[in-house]
Regions:
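Short active-site-adjacent structural elements
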Residues: 409, 427-430
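An N-terminus-focused feature that recognizes amino-terminal "leader" regions
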Residues: 2-334, 345-348, 358-364, 420-422, ...
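C-terminal, well-structured subdomains that either form a transmembrane helix-short loop-helix hairpin
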Residues: 95, 333-335, 339-421
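Short, glycine/serine-rich, charged loops/turns that create anion-binding
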Residues: 186, 375, 425
Length: 483
């Protein structure tokens, strides 16, 4: 009897375990398959191009430039890209998007607010910290501001923003702030179509685009699907509804709608922006200490306390380094856990003069490469063995490298630096040459038969390079050997 009960319990456990594994596997396949289903039939790429931004929208204190997301390479990867140039004391108005995105700080510094729904307002002022800036709310009372966390950022930071999360940023430096953003429209967090959408919570961004209407009409005649146009969501509501919802008068409700605001989506702040924020030096020191010692256990972060940015500009934190060729630094779900939720990652590469990056392919992700300095000769080859890109890419240009397409880069005389945004939280690659390459892992006889060469030739091919990913130029090493 006991044996029968034990056997029945064992079978019940097997059934429950099988159902749990099946459900988990189905859920994972649904998440991973959503991108493939959306882009099915859209990756027949015969030619890739290094592109400059195609459209620009001017505002009072800056400009936003857009790459043409209707281009085949962007449609294949399911991404959209733009570049913001924000002047000193420029405030990028609060907005949210329909897809998660990564931001890379190319130049400058500033601070930002990210409004996580339901999270507490942990930054609170006191009467002492207000000084003379607080305004009185009745006799003997001083207004004490409180808001969600303010985060500093600087050149080299990668910032992660989930879909539908409102955020703003401010340039508190003395030079222009240059920011590149890539949205992952094929992500499972985007339940709309593959058109990027920005929902602004202030101003009158639509007004700024009136000067570009002729350009937009021409763009539509060429087959573009949607304008790079956006507006203040409050402007669509009746004034009475807003007045009732916020408990204010109609005049203040009209200010929410920005009806008379012609400054655009990046506005200039008079004086300086007064917000509660920690000293920059203290926050940067904490980030550096956390970056060198951080070991996540998967339990210590909630959505309200999650780290949203990581700096990948520090040479001492490189993941791959060759003192004669260059370095590669990655940020992924291991060192920035929020990326496991966004299913995105990024890398920053530096190639020294004439150095080469080994031919490789991304195993599980598309890559969007943006050149930040210098130039390089880049070649990309597809599954048919045909070159779909063989050209130089220069600073400010962008190219999409589809999943599994093989790519190699060789820096010019001034070197080459780039940042690549990848559509997987832990993007992996495999090389074709070097000590950790696919060819190095094959038996000599397999190489000899596959390439119709002798075993000695196959052995030389297999052992020809001891470098891994970053490779020194043969011409440079040859000159050093002669010397």
């Amino acid at each position: 009897m006991a044996k029968s009960s034990l056997l029945s319990g064992f079978f019940c456990f097997l059934v429950l375990f099988h159902c749990s594994v099946a459900y988990s596997g189905r859920q994972q396949r649904e998440q991973q398959g959503q991108r493939g289903q959306r882009q099915q039939g859209e990756c027949q790429l015969n030619n890739l191009n290094a592109q400059e931004p195609q459209h620009r929208i001017q505002a009072e204190a800056g400009v936003t430039e857009f790459w043409d997301y209707n281009d085949d390479q962007f449609q294949c990867a399911g991404v959209a890209a733009c570049r913001h140039i924000i002047q000193p004391r420029g405030l990028f108005l609060p907005t949210y998007t329909n897809a998660p995105h990564l931001i890379y700080i190319v130049q400058g510094r500033g601070f930002q607010g990210v409004m996580m729904s339901g999270c507490p307002e942990t930054f609170q002022s006191s009467q002492q910290s207000e000084g003379g800036g607080g305004r009185r709310e009745g006799a003997g009372q001083r207004f004490r501001d409180q808001h969600q966390k303010i985060r500093h950022f600087r050149e080299g930071d990668v910032i992660a923003i989930p879909a539908g999360v409102a955020h703003w940023c401010y340039n508190d430096g003395d030079s222009e702030l240059v920011v590149v953003t890539v949205e992952d429209l094929g992500n499972n967090q985007n339940q709309l179509d593959n058109n990027p959408r920005k929902f602004f919570l202030a101003g009158n961004p639509r007004q700024q685009g009136q000067g570009q209407q002729q350009q937009q009409r021409e763009f539509h005649r060429r087959g573009g699907r949607e304008e790079h146009n956006f507006g203040n969501v409050f402007s669509g509501f009746d004034t009475e509804v807003l007045a009732e919802a916020f408990g204010v008068d109609r005049e203040m409700a009209r200010k929410l709608q920005g009806q008379d605001d012609n400054r655009g989506h990046i506005i200039r702040v008079e004086g300086d922006l007064q917000v509660l924020r920690p000293p920059r030096s203290r926050e940067e020191q904490e980030q550096q200490e956390r970056g060198s010692e951080y070991h996540a256990n998967g339990l210590e972060e909630t959505i309200c306390s999650a780290r949203l940015h990581e700096n990948i500009n520090d040479p001492s934190r490189a993941d791959i380094f060759n003192p004669r060729a260059g370095r590669l630094t990655t940020v992924n779900g291991f060192n920035l856990p929020i990326l496991n939720f966004l299913r995105l990652s990024a890398e920053r590469g530096v190639l020294y003069r004439n150095a080469m990056m080994a031919p490789l392919w991304k195993i599980n992700a598309h890559a969007v490469l943006y050149a930040t300095r210098g130039e390089a000769q880049v070649q990309i080859v597809d599954h048919r063995g045909q070159s779909v890109f063989n050209d130089r890419i220069r600073e400010g240009q962008l190219v999409v490298i589809p999943q599994n397409f093989v790519v190699t880069k060789q820096a010019g005389n001034e070197g080459f630096e780039w940042v690549a945004f990848t559509t997987h939280e832990n993007a992996m690659f495999s090389t074709l040459a070097g000590r950790t390459s696919a060819l190095r892992a094959m038996p000599v006889d397999v190489l000899a038969n596959a390439y119709q060469m002798s075993r000695d030739e196959a052995r030389r091919l297999k052992l020809s390079k001891e470098e891994t990913v970053m490779m020194e130029s043969r011409s440079r090493s040859g000159r050093r050997d002669v010397a």
